[in-house]
């Protein structure tokens, strides 16, 4: 199993396929295993790199290291270990935070950026309020109820259960107290850690904002607003999908992502 070294920790990653590189970055309810519906489709034409973000899955670290700067350094360390200088970043939720921060701080490493159901750690009142409400309801709903759309829960119960099982690979699901994990999430989105809204005008790489029509955390109307701030960006709305469109509607999301990369990525 390959690991990359970064800031005193070992980061688990996998590489498969050949072609221009794509780095897949999971959300806070998942890990590298969650991209199983993307890899068979992308790998015939792309080098696909998945990783367990620090504190998730096999990238073991104390929850006190849950920090966006660490995540960016880790992503670059994984690319270096894989021998990749430049990649398209596909980030879901938390992974989108990492993608945006990397695009701003290290534009030479990012060929394109696709933010999937991500509030982007942006200092936007509607997005911050949605995240705060999600923390309040954390104990009242299961991971699949919080992250998947109503249509998917009603029609794909088996895959919804698989989503929950993938999450259970993470220490946050079984060995970290809710209060400690919630504090880590809140700390990562502290006022001094947020990305200013006006920073979006500095994003230089081709950018896609993809969102599920039923996403309770990332409203479509806010994504339309952010699209206006990211020069040349595109918006894709996935019908009847919640906060995990890539998992709920993989065929549609894969088509949108591959088309975007083919047309816009600067590998």
Segments (PLM) and residue ranges:
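Flexible "cap/lid" loop of the alpha/beta hydrolase fold
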Residues: 100-105, 111-142
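Short beta-strand/loop motif that positions the catalytic acidic residue
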Residues: 203, 209-211, 215
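Conserved alpha/beta-hydrolase "acid-adjacent" motif
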Residues: 216-222
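Conserved alpha/beta-hydrolase catalytic His-Asp/Glu region
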Residues: 124-126, 142-201
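Alpha/beta-hydrolase fold catalytic core
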Residues: 1-22, 44-46, 84-85, 255-267
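Active-site loop/oxyanion-hole signature of alpha/beta-hydrolase fold enzymes
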Residues: 40, 49-94, 255
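Conserved HGGG/HGGXW glycine-rich cap/lid loop of the alpha/beta-hydrolase fold
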Residues: 7-64
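Catalytic active-site module of serine/aspartate enzymes centered on a nucleophile-bearing elbow/loop
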Residues: 232-267
């Amino acid at each position: 199993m390959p690991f990359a070294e970064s800031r005193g920790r070992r980061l688990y990653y996998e590489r498969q396929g050949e072609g221009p590189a794509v780095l897949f970055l999971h959300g806070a309810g998942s890990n590298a295993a969650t991209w199983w519906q993307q890899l068979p489709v992308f790998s015939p034409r792309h080098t696909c790199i998945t990783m367990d973000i620090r504190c998730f899955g096999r990238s073991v670290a104390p929850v006190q290291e849950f920090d966006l700067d660490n995540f960016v350094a880790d992503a670059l360390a994984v690319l270096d270990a894989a021998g990749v200088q430049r990649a398209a970043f596909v980030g879901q939720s938390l992974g989108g935070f990492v993608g945006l921060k990397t695009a701003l701080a290290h534009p030479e490493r990012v060929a394109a950026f696709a933010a999937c159901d991500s509030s982007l750690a942006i200092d936007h009142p509607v997005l911050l309020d949605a995240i705060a409400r999600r923390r309040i309801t954390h104990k009242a709903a299961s991971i699949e109820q919080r992250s998947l759309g109503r249509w998917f829960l009603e029609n794909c119960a088996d895959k919804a259960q698989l989503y929950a099982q993938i999450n259970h690979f993470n220490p946050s699901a079984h060995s970290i107290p809710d209060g400690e994990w919630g504090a880590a999430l809140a700390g990562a989105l502290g006022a001094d850690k947020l990305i200013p809204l006006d920073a979006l005008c500095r994003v230089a790489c081709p950018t896609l904002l993809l969102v599920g029509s039923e996403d309770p955390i990332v409203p479509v109307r806010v994504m339309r607003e952010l699209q206006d701030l990211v020069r040349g960006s595109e918006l894709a709305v996935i019908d009847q999908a919640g906060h995990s469109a890539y998992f709920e509607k993989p065929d549609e999301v894969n088509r949108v992502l591959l088309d975007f990369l083919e047309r816009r990525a600067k590998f």
